[in-house]
């Protein structure tokens, strides 16, 4: 499993709250057990909430997960990686993103692309 934490807010991110953080080992284990092979993310945790984005690959499909949450649940609790919501390539994913969303995942996208994912 490839895991990459960008470790900072994306340059053009409009919502910057909390402190940059990492996924917990238990959260990584849950994602691994879901069959995810690649995880690229940035995440920030505040007092009672968190924000972030995850670009991940499962069963040869790319997914975007919004890691934002309140104190009622954590950053991966509501993850939905349905095959109907995935993209067969990074190119297809980029074409489907709004400009605003792409700004928040651009460093993750660029790293995945650099790692020779398609």
Short names for language-model regions:
Residues 9, 20, 48, 52-54, ...:
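Compositionally biased, intrinsically disordered low-complexity regions
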Residues 1-18, 80-118:
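Low-complexity intrinsically disordered segments
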Residues 1-4, 23, 32:
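Secondary-structure boundary elements
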Residues 25-69:
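Amphipathic, interaction-prone secondary-structure segments
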Residues 58-92:
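Intrinsically disordered, low-complexity regulatory segments enriched in Ser/Thr/Pro
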Residues 1, 18, 34-37, 74:
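Residue-level marker of intrinsically disordered, low-complexity segments enriched
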């Amino acid at each position: 499993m490839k895991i990459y934490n960008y470790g900072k807010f994306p340059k053009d991110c409009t919502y910057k709250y909390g402190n940059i953080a990492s996924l917990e080992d238990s959260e990584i284990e849950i994602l691994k057990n879901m069959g995810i092979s690649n995880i690229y993310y940035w995440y920030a945790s505040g007092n009672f909430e968190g924000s972030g984005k995850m670009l991940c690959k499962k069963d040869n499909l790319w997914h975007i997960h919004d890691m934002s949450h309140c104190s009622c649940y954590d950053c991966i609790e509501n993850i939905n990686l349905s095959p109907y919501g995935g993209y067969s390539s990074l190119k297809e994913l980029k074409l489907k993103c709004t400009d605003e969303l792409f700004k928040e995942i651009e460093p993750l996208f660029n790293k995945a692309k650099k790692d020779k994912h398609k």
